[in-house]
Amino acid sequence: MIIGTKQEFENLADYVLRDYLGSEYESYSPFNVTAFAEEYLKLEISFFDFNPEENIEGMRIGNKIILDRRLCDPIRVGERNFTVAHECGHEIINWQDPTYVPYQITNYRFKNQHKELKTEDDFKEWQANVVASCLLLRPNLVMWSMDKFLKADKLTVFGDCRFYALDLYYFKMMARYLGVSQTCLFYRLSRLGLLDHQPDSAYDPRKDVLYR
């Protein structure tokens, strides 16, 4: 298992992104994670009808990523992209291990798989999630999107996760443009210091209007 801090895994993802994108790194185009997986990491992506009761979103066998066909639904593009990015994260991290043999890999990704970090596998999943969010949401793209959609340097959050209605509307539009889930975007905004955390008591319903 590769050991490292969150910052070190974020730096690793950024290094790989710059190598793959070149001058396009500074562009404002959403990241095509499928093309990255196939062109840069040489992974093959296909779809399969998994049993819905098993909550499998994807699996990895050797250099093949097999996704649940339900992720083809346009409304689940964020889930699909993150699942691919998650597997890319595993691959990038595994590259750092000189004993890594890609064709011996077999694992599954389950929907809503939230675990405490107790086992080695738990930490590996956490590592892949960190890299995945960085691949999908490089800093310059996120900050440009903040200015484009929210017209602000930071997104105001009251309590744990309460927004003004208009801010929430543009936040959802931003996630849709970037091709990520709202959960992934919220986490990345937090890591980049782009959330303005306020107590619930600071929320003013008089300002909570849909249109400015």
Task: Set out the residue ranges of the language-model regions.
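Active-site hotspot residues in diverse enzymes, especially metal/ion-binding acidic/histidine motifs
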Residues: 1-212
